[in-house]
């Protein structure tokens, strides 16, 4: 069982929050997975110009305590700099990403815990700045 919460109804395939329950394989995640080509270009442009903003988000104590870092699944990372970007750009490791997500495995017991709402909310709150950054990128006109 799983559910997805979108953060912006006006954007197709907008960033959001994902809660997945599967025995011994539950997790919580957020961000945007495999955005469409034009959206990916907008996100990379935002990262290139506002790298410091993204760096602050992923270095934030709350984010790091819940998710450590953005997901870097090998299949979702380019081997080289994306077309049009300097391979020495300060944000090159972010620019190589094809998806901009963070996820964390969670114990199945959280779903029956009396504090379920509070525990899940703290994780979703930690993801909000990432989703805000991604929404800002997607709302930017070319």
Task: Describe each region flagged by the PLM.
Residues 1-22, 26:
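Short, conserved beta-strand/beta-arch hydrophobic-aromatic motifs that form part
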Residues 21-80:
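Compact, glycine/acidic-enriched structural inserts
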Residues 1-9, 60-66, 86-99:
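Short, surface-exposed, charge-dense and proline/glycine-enriched linear segments
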Residues 48, 69-142:
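Long, solvent-exposed, polar/charged low-complexity segments
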Residues 7, 32-34, 104-106:
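Short, structured patches in soluble enzyme cores that scaffold and shape functional sites
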Residues 9, 25, 36, 108-110:
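Residues that cap or initiate secondary-structure elements
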């Amino acid at each position: 069982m799983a559910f997805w919460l979108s953060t912006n109804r006006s954007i197709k395939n907008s960033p959001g929050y994902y809660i997945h329950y599967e025995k011994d394989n539950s997790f919580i995640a957020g961000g945007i997975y495999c955005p469409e080509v034009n959206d990916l270009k907008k996100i990379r442009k935002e990262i290139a110009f506002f790298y410091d903003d993204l760096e602050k988000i992923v270095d934030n104590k709350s984010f790091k305590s819940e998710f450590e870092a953005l997901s870097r699944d090998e299949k979702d990372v380019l081997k080289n700099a994306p077309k049009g970007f300097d391979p020495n750009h300060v944000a090159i490791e972010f620019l190589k990403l094809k998806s901009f997500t963070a996820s964390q495995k969670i114990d199945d017991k959280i779903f029956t815990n009396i504090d379920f709402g509070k525990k899940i909310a703290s994780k979703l709150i930690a993801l909000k700045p990432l989703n805000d950054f991604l929404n800002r990128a997607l709302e930017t006109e070319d």
